[in-house]
Amino acid sequence: MSEHREAVRTARSVVVKIGTTALTTPSGVFDANRLASLVEAIEGRMKAGSDVVIVSSGAIAAGIEPLGLSKRPTDLATKQAAASVGQVALVNAWSAAFAVYNRTVGQVLLTAHDISMRVQHNNAQRTLDRLRALHAVAIVNENDTVATNEIRFGDNDRLSALVAHLVGADALILLSDIDGLYDGDPRKATPDKPARFIPEVAAQGDLDGVVAGRGSSLGTGGMASKLSSALLAADAGVPVLLAAAADAGRALDDASVGTVFAPRPERMSARKFWMRYAAESAGALTLDDGAVRAVIKQRRSLLPAGITSVTGRFHGGDVVDLRALDGHTVARGVVAYDQAELASIIGRSTHELPVEMRRPAVHADDLVRT
């Protein structure tokens, strides 16, 4: 067994993401029995000593039948109505399944916006930490009744990666109808063009030839979403296992199935992870070539002298993108000036500025490369 599978197998704190297709029948009906089977596997991991946080999709699917709908809705308002009804059924199903093992569950509804705002981010972290301290099983889901982009893209894949870092998890396990990563669609493979299974992703070269497909009609997250989320978590220092829900027992027991994603050697700090992946950008600073070198290669602070233009409306303490002259983002950071104030001093050397304004536009400690 590789060291990365071993890391998943022995992880003491685990986030398990359950996709919509793992909780529904082939016809799209929410299936409480499937959920109960997953809880049995999760309970086995918890009895072995691991702390588990669950990120559960399926609210919209769970609301289809109670509302008398024949299929998953396509318009936003009906999706949100289905989510409103389905969320009740979903959390009740989780609660009933864990009650068999005398465990209490707590529901945490989030949107990407909640994670992006530092105050809400910290509040969510405290809530999850307290639930775990009280030995309750946290069931996290996106708040689909108010979310917009989140309800259409990701199927909780990205949220699970953010939650994994939020709670300081040692591993992230993604369970759905996808049994791992392939360099082609296995459903369309032929003897002449087989789809090669990729057991481990440890370097960019391991992804050569990988084609990211679309999700099923029941969920919204396809291979592209799962791959992006797995790489996000791995880049932050969290090992990831992508496996089929049908193999949940083995995935949670010994990590012997699916594709494992190797984490970066050093775990990213919570603050830098938030800046890079969670925070919403309030604007952008365009840097000259010298400033890009100073920030990226020399890891120095960004001074007003190296900024050529400022866009957006931001205040000191907001997160902004740092862009090269060709427009691509090279870093993100917490800006020390309001937009109007910074715009008035860009391109000027520090000694030209009043004493009270001789500070970096973005300090090196508040920068993260992208």
Swiss-Prot record:
Chief place where the protein resides: cytoplasm
Ranges where the PUA domain occurs: 282-360
Domain of life of the source: Bacteria
Positions of ATP binding: K17, S176, D177, T220, G221, G222, M223, A224, S225, K226
Catalyses which reaction(s): L-glutamate + ATP = L-glutamyl 5-phosphate + ADP
Residue intervals passing through the bilayer: none
GO biological process, one term: L-proline biosynthetic process
GO cellular component labels: cytosol
Pathway info: Amino-acid biosynthesis; L-proline biosynthesis; L-glutamate 5-semialdehyde from L-glutamate: step 1/2
Binding site for substrate: S57, D144, N156
Cross-referenced InterPro entries: AceGlu_kinase-like_sf, Asp/Glu/Uridylate_kinase, G5K_ProB, Glu/AcGlu_kinase, Glu_5kinase, Glu_5kinase/COase_Synthase, Glutamate_5-kinase_CS, PUA
Gene Ontology molecular functions: ATP binding; glutamate 5-kinase activity; RNA binding
Compartments reported by the entry: Cytoplasm
Function: Catalyzes the transfer of a phosphate group to glutamate to form L-glutamate 5-phosphate.
NCBIfam families linked: proB
HAMAP family: ProB (MF_00456)
Family that this chain belongs to: Belongs to the glutamate 5-kinase family.
Protein's recorded name: Glutamate 5-kinase
The organism of origin for this protein: Mycolicibacterium smegmatis (strain ATCC 700084 / mc(2)155) (Mycobacterium smegmatis)
